[in-house]
């Protein structure tokens, strides 16, 4: 089985996050995206410290689909430099991990 990844990204607001999530799931780039509003981010950008409300997206995908997910997310994201970070899932419920892999197949298998 392909390596499963958990991809972390922030968006400026819940509506933008939901739009990104829906597109990525509809295009089979992510099997599932959790949208978690209410995040506060503090970061340094262009020489200043900023504090902003953001919404977190937690995406589940495969290593094989990650390059396409990253490219699509980068194209759709409103930030100049979006936070897109992926970590490998070292363990999980095998049936769930299989489901993630099946939902992100470029060409879905026939349910024959």
What are these regions (language model features)?
Residues 1-112:
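Positively charged, small/polar-rich N-terminal and surface patches that mediate targeting and assembly
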């Amino acid at each position: 089985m392909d390596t499963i990844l958990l991809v972390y990204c922030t968006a400026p607001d819940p509506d933008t996050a939901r739009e990104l999530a829906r597109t990525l799931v509809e295009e089979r780039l992510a099997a599932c995206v959790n949208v978690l509003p209410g995040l506060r981010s503090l970061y340094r950008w262009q020489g200043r410290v900023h504090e902003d409300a953001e919404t977190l997206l937690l995406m589940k995908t495969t290593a094989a689909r990650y390059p396409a997910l990253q490219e699509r997310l980068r194209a759709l994201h409103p930030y100049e430099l979006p936070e897109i970070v992926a970590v490998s899932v070292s363990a999980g419920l095998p049936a769930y991990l299989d489901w993630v892999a099946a939902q992100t197949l470029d060409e879905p298998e026939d349910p024959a």
